[in-house]
């Protein structure tokens, strides 16, 4: 590890500890040249697929963009920040576990809607109206009809 003080490449690890609920390892190091101490952190690299947009563009998976969309859909609804974070965690985990290099934005949108459908129907309809780009009230009513039909015993 390169010393942040003198740039020397050799050091020794003095102490290692797990941190952040076991997701991070904190290491105290001492430079072999200047003998100053510094701290480094190690974590598993998240390998998330690239998102392929409807127009063919490719973007890195952006968890914050996902959370923003969920917050907008859930605005003024009885949905907690923890519930929004749990949905984002689940979708991110599903994307990681798919082990695919690319994922379609439409697939992510469908996953969001599946989670919102069970959490809050109003948030679901809000998200669907933007995601599916309803052009008129008839398309909106068709989606509401599907929701009502799925809810009926």
Swiss-Prot record:
Keywords: ATP-binding, DNA-binding, Metal-binding, Nucleotide-binding, Repressor, Transcription, Transcription regulation, Zinc, Zinc-finger
Cofactor(s) the protein requires to work: Zn(2+)
Cofactor note: Binds 1 zinc ion.
Domain of life from the UniProt record: Bacteria
Pfam family for this entry, one: ATP-cone
ZnF (unnamed) ranges: 3-34
Domain ATP-cone: 49-139
InterPro entries recorded: ATP-cone_dom (IPR005144), NrdR-like_N (IPR055173), RNR_NrdR-like (IPR003796)
Any one biological process term the GO annotation gives: negative regulation of DNA-templated transcription
Gene Ontology MF terms in the entry: ATP binding; DNA binding; zinc ion binding
Chain's role: Negatively regulates transcription of bacterial ribonucleotide reductase nrd genes and operons by binding to NrdR-boxes.
Family: Belongs to the NrdR family.
Family matches, as HAMAP family: NrdR
This protein's name: Transcriptional repressor NrdR
């Amino acid at each position: 590890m390169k010393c942040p003080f003198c740039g020397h490449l050799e050091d020794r690890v003095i102490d290692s500890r797990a941190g952040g609920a076991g997701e991070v390892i904190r290491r105290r190091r001492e430079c072999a040249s200047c003998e100053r101490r510094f701290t480094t952190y190690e974590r598993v690299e998240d390998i998330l697929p690239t998102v392929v947009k409807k127009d063919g563009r490719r973007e890195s998976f952006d968890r914050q963009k996902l959370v923003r969309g969920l917050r907008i859909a859930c605005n003024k609804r009885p949905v907690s920040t923890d519930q929004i974070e749990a949905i984002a965690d689940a979708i991110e985990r599903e994307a990681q576990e798919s082990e695919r290099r690319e994922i379609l934005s439409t697939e992510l949108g469908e996953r969001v809607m599946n989670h919102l459908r069970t959490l809050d129907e109003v948030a679901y309809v809000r998200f669907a109206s933007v995601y599916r780009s309803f052009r008129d009230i008839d398309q909106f009513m068709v989606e509401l009809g599907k929701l009502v039909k799925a809810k009926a015993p």
